[in-house]
């Protein structure tokens, strides 16, 4: 018997926690339970209400169809306000389960584990074996005829020319590998040096990625490295063709000047000879 003089029991939070957890779980179960019947007005009930027939007798053959809620796993829209309820999983999940088992064994894994040690004999890594600098040892850039001599360098050079009216045009651009400036009044200017430096910084990345390790045969290159290698070869060919066309254009200009001077000389000599006679 507890009296006012009896010592008060000490507070024990463990019992209260157990009691509150059990009460919380019971309330959650009651709240998350799906009702057996929901009306169109929003009212619902869990009573087992059976529908009676014309004679007042209750039949249970349509109990599950009219009272219980059957939630299908999949609803397929057929069109024309029609749908199909199925219990099967979607085709994507069925295909994935047919290829990849749900419970793989120890030796079968879905994702390959990356190796802890990577060796150069098995993996492709770029190296600094090939020089990618387009600048000579004396510090001068490559222009004019030096392009033909240094065609094997890693860097792809874009020679820029300036028209007589000051409009700059690129002889070789990344988006148009066959663009060649064949105007008759092309002169190199100071803007070409600045454009060379900008183009050099832009192409350093591709040149560094293209450099592969020493001793790697061409058959072992990855597709990305092969694409970069083909781009470099096309750039070299385009550079040589550009240099040849520039030389041909300059030679044509020189021949025109020589022909004009020679024709003017013979015309003047003819006029002087006629005047003398």
UniProtKB/Swiss-Prot annotation:
The modification Phosphoserine is found at residues 127, 129, 132-133, 179, 182, 190. Residues 174-200 have a biased composition (Polar residues). Pfam families: Miff. Residues 1-256 are cytoplasmic. Residues 124-148, 167-200 are annotated as: Disordered. It is found in: Endoplasmic reticulum membrane; Mitochondrion outer membrane; Peroxisome. GO terms for cellular component: cytoplasm; endoplasmic reticulum; endoplasmic reticulum membrane; mitochondrial outer membrane; peroxisome. The chain crosses the membrane at residues 257-274. It is a single-pass type IV membrane protein. GO terms for biological process: mitochondrial fission; peroxisome fission; protein secretion. Keywords: Coiled coil, Endoplasmic reticulum, Membrane, Mitochondrion, Mitochondrion outer membrane, Peroxisome, Phosphoprotein, Transmembrane, Transmembrane helix. Residues 225-253 form a coiled coil. The modification Phosphothreonine is found at residues 177, 216, 222. Residues 275-277 are lumenal. Belongs to the Tango11 family. May play a role in mitochondrial and peroxisomal fission. This is Transport and Golgi organization protein 11. It comes from Drosophila melanogaster (Fruit fly).
